[in-house]
Amino acid sequence: MTLPPAFFVGANLPWIRYGGDFGANAWAPAGLSQHSEPDRIASLFETLRAHGITTIRWFFLCDGRAGVRFGADGFPDGLDDVVFRDVDTALSWAERAGLGVLPVLLDFHWCMPARTVNGVQLGGRRLVLSRPSGRQRLIETVIAPLFERYGRDSRVHGWDLINEPEWVTLGVGTWNARKSILRPAMRSYIRDAAACAHARVVQPVTVGSASSRWLGLVKGLGLDFYQPHWYDSFESRAPLAMPVEAMRCDRPLVLGEFPTRGSARAPDVVIEMARAAGYQGAMFWSVLADDPATDFECAREALAAGVRRT
């Protein structure tokens, strides 16, 4: 996202159907371009805009279940034939409501142990990120084409290279070698993908970090802003009130996720604490995720109550 000069509030959509919004798979011949209820989504987006939201964080390729063609070696060979059509649809819906999109290219589930459902592999792609040849194929055949097509599109407010990579980085968020890659490999992916972006896009580039305590994983890799997440379980080691200047980052910070359910702090309190700490914005979790951290009505009430946005 192009960071505004003053504090802003955004929203994690984060998907309409996890892994199924962009590209074809066993469940649908396409993603959003063949969605059965576009009017419902349009109404939802208008509601977000009416509450002052200008940017939505949207997961694109997720765990690799759709949108990417893989070769016999398990490495990417390119985007499938409907991805661009689906992205065009997403951006069109957002534009009509006056929203911009922050695409999240990959989720950490990309690296989790593979599962097969209805003949579709979910996850199990960690070698793509751990091996130099896999990273090169991913960036050249999947990520670069997205940057080239949408890198100057004003409806795209930024690019998130991977969501919460710490959970699959050995020695950072996990010690399970079966579902992780080495720290140097993850840093290489982020560095190379950021360099690819800077050669092709005008929007800023970021990574959704699981916690501010792990920002060291992504520092010094060419990101344009840092995007730590905050949940109550991290409070003891990464307090929400910690001043941004104490984190010694060379770029601005945006609070990329915070819970709207199950937290000791109400959404409006989190937003004001983030503002006071020096963040440039905060994006609540979430609008449509069906999980214990999501309460969209609670978020709406907080915004309607007058959380100041500029």
Feature-to-residue mapping (PLM):
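Short, well-ordered alpha-helix to beta-strand connector turns
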Residues: 223-224, 250
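Active-site mouth of glycoside hydrolases
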Residues: 2-223, 258, 262-263, 277, ...
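Substrate-binding surface in catalytic domains of secreted glycosidases
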Residues: 234-242
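Mature extracellular/periplasmic domains of secretome proteins
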Residues: 215-220, 241-247, 270-276
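Substrate-binding cleft of secreted/luminal carbohydrate-active enzymes
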Residues: 9, 57, 249-310
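His/Asp/Glu-enriched short active-site or ligand-binding loop at hydrolase and phosphoryl-transfer sites
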Residues: 229-234, 283-285
